[in-house]
């Protein structure tokens, strides 16, 4: 993992077996999520520095680095798009929400145009984004269509309605799996990670979406990071009948 975060966060037991690189900082990026009947309100309370190409360890770069999968996951404009150049042979996954938001009024997050999409997306293997990442105006759907034209695989997540996979000129709806929701925070991150892992394993964008939907369903049934499921939990969820 490459991140910009304080030492105390890197030393949490949750990360004891993860190789964490990147600059140690005084503050971490902090969000506050408030879930309302009409959707999520989000606020930025603190921001960490930008992560740049030079923060990638030299031994991880290029063909010699042997990195097979990269998940570029900006949350608040903190990832330099040039990071993808360090991994020329990897499957590159992108969750772009951090490129598509600003927080001008008291830290309240709002959707904006992603001006760098046309340059970055042709270098990306799979794009994962949610309905919440896009503007609610008609421009939101226009942006989605532009992304579909620029990236070979787009996974558009829609919460309890599952997701739609855009690939090869086709749109395939993949239903969600049953779940008793306790905490939806982080479900998108779990979906994206599971999707990229299974896409790398199978090469099948639709099969990967089924796997990722099952992982996300498991995740929302527990609070916080405790909800990250095991492989056996995901496989058990896959044996259930998806929601129609």
Describe the role of every protein-language-model region.
Residues 29-34, 101-107, 181-185:
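Short, charged, surface-exposed secondary-structure boundary motifs
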Residues 64-65, 121-122, 148:
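A short, aliphatic-rich alpha-helical micro-motif
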Residues 40-49, 111-123, 174:
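A polyampholytic, Gly/Pro-enriched intrinsically disordered region
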Residues 69-144, 161-162:
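Conserved beta-alpha-beta core of the PfkB/ribokinase-like small-molecule kinase fold
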Residues 25-26, 96-100, 177-180:
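Short, acidic/turn-prone active-site loops that include or flank metal/cofactor-
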Residues 140-244:
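Conserved phosphate-binding/catalytic region of the ribokinase-like
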Residues 1-73, 77-78, 83-93, 236-244:
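Conserved N-terminal subdomain of the carbohydrate kinase-like
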Residues 18, 67, 90-91, 124, ...:
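A structural micro-motif
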